[in-house]
Amino acid sequence: MSATGQYLLEELEGRLSPILATTFGYYSLQVGCAGLADRLQQACRVKHQFTLGEADQENHIQANPSMLPVASDSVDLVILMHHLSNTSEPHAILREVFRILIPEGKLVIIDFNPKSLWGLRHFFQSWLEHVPFKGHFYTAKRIDDWMRLLGFDQNRLYRIGYLPPIQKPSLIRHLSWLEKGMR
């Protein structure tokens, strides 16, 4: 993993850990970035954690995220990890999440802001070789509109990733004040 990727992962863990540590229940499901599920969900207090990913791995489900083989009103927590921006059917995904979540369940959406430096990098992706996510980035306002249509209540919006998409660890350390100053 690149220095930038490691930095973003640590920032994400810092934001997710308090949320996951206060979420209780029987079932959680992470959709997207299956390789990071174990690390990101370490603080999760939900009893059974599943990930949409490789079917040959323990606790991984292989399915279409817009047609999950999960009972309605049965999941306490869903984490959409960079998935809305990498699907052609974001509305269908959100409808399916709404279907499987219990009435007081939590949905955590993790994605890049199209108006950020990462979003600008996405805009120039045709000239860049190693862009990690090549989908369509949606604004927080657009996602909030979709959520309201489905009946979700948004409690919190956190932003991370104020650093530019750079690879030099020394430059990342020197610019870390951007991340702290924007909170």
Predicted regions mapped to residue ranges:
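A C-terminal cap/extension of S-adenosyl-L-methionine-dependent methyltransferases
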Residues: 159-183
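Short alpha-helix
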Residues: 124, 134-157
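Class I SAM-dependent methyltransferase Rossmann-like catalytic core
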Residues: 1-21
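Conserved class I S-adenosyl-L-methionine
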Residues: 106-134
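Class I SAM-dependent methyltransferase SAM/SAH-binding core
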Residues: 14, 18-68
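A short SAM/SAH-binding and catalytic strip from SAM-dependent methyltransferases
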Residues: 76-91
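A short glycine-rich, Lys/Arg-flanked "PGG" loop and its adjoining helix->strand segment in the class I
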Residues: 91-106
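A short acidic, Gly/Pro-enriched loop at the edge of an enzyme's catalytic core
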Residues: 66-78
